[in-house]
Amino acid sequence: MTAQLIDGKTISAALLDRVAAGVKARTEAGKRAPALAVILVGNNPASEVYVRNKKKGCEKAGIQSLAYDLPESTSEADLLALVDELNARSDVDGILVQLPLPRHINPETVIERINPKKDVDGFHPYNMGRLAVKMPLLRPCTPRGVMIMLEHAGISVEGKHAVVIGQSNIVGRPMALELLMERATVTICHSRTRDLPEEVKRADIIVAAVGIPRFVKGDWVKPGAVVIDVGINRLEDGKLCGDVDFDAAKEHASWITPVPGGVGLMTVATLLANTLDAANLHA
């Protein structure tokens, strides 16, 4: 068995087209285009790449992009003041603070300061709580993107055993909630999980989000399982790889996402979908 690819490039392009159509419908109805404010503190090279990709996505979708590039020395108080200013602006629909932040700034404090209806990352406790009670408003981007990929591939999660490896607030926890909302049986694994390979071997659907190159081995994947690789890791030779040993896992899985070309592309597309949703909440 060789797995079929779940192609993030094709699926994200289709989602961007839908977002662009939604933006066009707004402007044709006499409403303004959605606006996304992106705040970058410091000069983390990976963050700069992510921010550039988000700006390109905005241009493709017709969303106005507002960039706030702040020095590494920016105080938490000054960052919170900028968030307050953007919260108050009626012409700004989404606010994104690029993570990670410098060590002297508490990310939880900043995330909680964002108006939940402008929290297009979906990280605010209000939005996480709504997802937990099956009343999602703005959903965390990567898990939402994964669910769109599964739907596009015609993969139903209902009644399936899904194993999520990783318990971060950004991916692992909301991913489990998304799967649970679609009636999967969900197991969350983490660094204290006993006999992790055996837990993973029972999975019909595996979502790997640990940030360790090729952490999930091919022989952990039971025949016919669906493998979703959220990881993006840069190796010493400059090449990118995921959290799954792709070449080995694809010989066991029925479907698998590649890295690059998989979940990462969906994260930007779902961010823009959230920005359109946020604009429609406001007007």
Swiss-Prot record:
Q: Does the keyword Coiled coil apply?
A: no
Which processes are annotated in GO (biological process)? Answer: L-histidine biosynthetic process; methionine biosynthetic process; purine nucleotide biosynthetic process; tetrahydrofolate interconversion
The Swiss-Prot or TrEMBL record annotates one GO molecular function as: methylenetetrahydrofolate dehydrogenase (NADP+) activity
Q: Does the keyword NADP apply?
A: yes
Task: Write out the entry's keywords from A to Z.
Answer: Amino-acid biosynthesis, Histidine biosynthesis, Hydrolase, Methionine biosynthesis, Multifunctional enzyme, NADP, One-carbon metabolism, Oxidoreductase, Purine biosynthesis
Q: In which pathway does it act?
A: One-carbon metabolism; tetrahydrofolate interconversion
Gene Ontology CC, one term: cytosol
* Catalyses which reaction(s): (6R)-5,10-methylene-5,6,7,8-tetrahydrofolate + NADP(+) = (6R)-5,10-methenyltetrahydrofolate + NADPH; (6R)-5,10-methenyltetrahydrofolate + H2O = (6R)-10-formyltetrahydrofolate + H(+)
Transmembrane ranges?
none
UniProt xrefs under Gene3D superfamilies:
Leucine Dehydrogenase, chain A, domain 1 (3.40.50.10860), NAD(P)-binding Rossmann-like Domain (3.40.50.720)
Which residues are noted in the entry as NADP(+)-binding? G166, Q167, S168, S191, I232
Q: What is its EC number?
A: 1.5.1.5, 3.5.4.9
**Alphabetical list of Pfam families matching this protein:** THF_DHG_CYH, THF_DHG_CYH_C
The entry sums up its family as follows: Belongs to the tetrahydrofolate dehydrogenase/cyclohydrolase family.
Q: Oligomeric state and partners? A: Homodimer.
Q: What does this protein do?
A: Catalyzes the oxidation of 5,10-methylenetetrahydrofolate to 5,10-methenyltetrahydrofolate and then the hydrolysis of 5,10-methenyltetrahydrofolate to 10-formyltetrahydrofolate.
List the protein's name: Bifunctional protein FolD
- Tell me which species this is from: Laribacter hongkongensis (strain HLHK9)
Q: Taxonomic lineage per UniProt?
A: Bacteria, Pseudomonadati, Pseudomonadota, Betaproteobacteria, Neisseriales
Gene assigned in the entry: folD
